[in-house]
Swiss-Prot record:
UniProtKB keywords: Amidation, Cleavage on pair of basic residues, D-amino acid, Hormone, Signal
Protein name: Fulicin peptides
Recorded GO MF terms: hormone activity
D-asparagine, modified sites: N123
Length: 357
């Protein structure tokens, strides 16, 4: 039991000694105060003002702020800049943006770099309309601030003079060069006089903004007139007239010679010569032909549509023709040919565009 008691006493003594060495106060919520980092920004719009007694930053006094910025002395600024670098002790410290001339606070506390102070440059082109020549204003160098710098920049566009001639005080050459550059500048519109000239501005300019039909439609050759019927329909040869009912070429077979002509269904029957003997001048439903009626012999039976009064001779002739028809119908091949011809004739009457095999 004695070693255990000694171990407990030694542990308690060490604990009290550690607590006594710690500083008093709430050490969990206390944080050492850090001095802010002082940054300076170039603000061209800031004007110089007299320094106050409590101001820790000196005021820069320049003779002409817009013409010569190099005349100011920044030796005391470098000392303050070194002092500000010594105050920075980490990455998460707060920084205050002050004006380099007046020492005024320009913005709230920022973390990190001062990259947001630089003006943002839009690399992507946002479309604008083309300015007309009469809308573009004239340029006058005497009324513009920094006209001498403009002349120096534009002097490189011509070979009439050099910037050194202007700096030497030769006002005659200076005025001649400036007039030439101004005449060139006034002839250009706003887009041509800008730093960047874009070939593609906004949407494509049409020849006539109000026209509804464009020159090219789709991926194939353009149509000449959208209102008219198309010249080519489908994959086959085009039709001459869209409105006509009967086409010259229908289907895959040969076309009709005359679309309006209908087949009259005149068929020649060739009966067997063994049963019936033919007469050269035989015409059914007609009497014997006289010598004066030779013109009627060559007349086709299909063209005769009238009816005549029958006589006894015609009745005998009709009976003989009926006997001959009965004899023909006994032939199987003739019946097949006759049925095929009758079917084709019926189709031609009901469907004029049908072509039989």
């Amino acid at each position: 039991m004695q070693p255990t008691v000694l171990l407990i006493l030694m542990t308690s003594c060490l604990t009290y000694q550690v607590i006594a060495d710690k500083p008093k106060g709430n050490h969990l919520h206390s944080r050492p105060e850090r001095s802010p980092i002082v940054l300076f920004s170039d603000a061209p719009h800031a004007a110089a003002s007299p320094a106050d007694e409590n101001d820790n930053f000196p005021v820069l006094k320049t003779a002409n702020q817009y013409e010569d910025n190099n005349s100011a002395t920044f030796s005391h600024l470098e000392e303050k800049h070194d002092f500000a670098e010594k105050q920075s002790t980490g990455d998460d410290e707060e920084s205050v943006i002050l004006n380099r001339v007046t020492g005024e606070v320009l913005s709230d506390t920022v973390d990190g770099s001062q990259g947001h102070l630089e003006p943002k440059r839009f690399n992507e082109f946002v479309g604008k309309r083309n300015t007309l020549p009469e809308e573009a204003g004239s340029f006058d160098a005497d009324s513009q601030p920094g006209s001498l710098d403009t002349v120096r920049i534009l002097a490189g566009l011509s070979n009439f003079g050099q910037p050194q001639i202007i700096d030497q005080g030769n006002m005659k050459n200076h005025r001649t060069l400036k007039n030439m550059i101004h005449n060139l500048y006034n002839t250009m519109n706003e887009d041509e006089a800008s730093k960047r000239q874009y070939e593609f501005v906004g949407k494509r300019s049409y020849d006539f903004v109000g026209k509804r039909t464009y020159d090219f439609l789709g991926k194939r050759s353009p149509y000449y007139f959208l209102g008219k019927r198309y010249d080519f329909i489908g994959k086959r040869s085009p039709y001459d007239f869209i409105g006509k009912k009967n086409y010259d070429f229908v289907g895959k077979r040969s076309p009709y010679d005359f679309v309006g002509k209908r087949n009259q269904g005149v068929f020649t029957v060739s009966p067997s010569s063994t049963k019936i003997s033919f007469d050269d001048n035989y015409l059914p439903y007609l009497s014997s032909v006289d010598a004066g009626d030779l013109s009627d012999v060559n007349k086709r039976y299909a063209e005769f549509l009238g009816k005549r009064k029958r006589t006894a001779e015609q009745d005998e002739t009709s009976q003989r023709s009926n006997e001959r028809l009965v004899a023909l119908l006994q032939n199987t091949g003739f019946r097949k040919r006759l049925s095929r011809m009758l079917q084709n004739q019926r189709l031609v009457e009901h469907y004029p565009e049908f072509i039989g095999k």
